[in-house]
């Protein structure tokens, strides 16, 4: 009843407050902290979508920022690299390796300034994953999180 409704509201408010904190990070402080916040949002969206969602997922001596698996002993279904001022070539290399190894769906999160470089690398060196990879912006991830939370809240209100 009433307590449950209040709890749901507070849970929602907490999550919306989290995304607002992420969005309001000053531009000059965005490097690593924005990277980690976007990584954490992707992990949370994976959980909301019913995946086993992990950060810093191991990949042959390297780490993927986020990996979503369907089952405990399964391989990642979706893998994410968040590139906020980092090495785009290294990120694409990890995503290609995950795709080759596990047939995972690769996603790269970039800022607008890196779009041209990513497109150039996908038309050359990484052409094998050009048709599979999804290029997301920080704004795309923020919107995905908002929509996932709104969808959960709608289902709760409807009792579904």
Where is each model-derived feature located?
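Acidic-basic catalytic patches of nuclease active cores, encompassing PD-(D/E)XK
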Residues: 21-64, 69-72
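Broad gene-expression machinery/nucleic-acid interaction feature
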Residues: 6, 63, 79, 105
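Nuclease-adjacent, charged terminal/linker segments that flank catalytic cores
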Residues: 1-26
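Catalytic core segments in nucleotide and nucleic-acid processing enzymes
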Residues: 81-114
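A short acidic, amphipathic alpha-helical/loop segment
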Residues: 41, 68, 91-98, 121
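Domain-level recognition of nuclease-like catalytic cores that cleave nucleotide substrates
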Residues: 58-60, 113-160
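Active-site beta-strand-loop-beta-strand hairpin of nuclease catalytic cores
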Residues: 67-79, 99
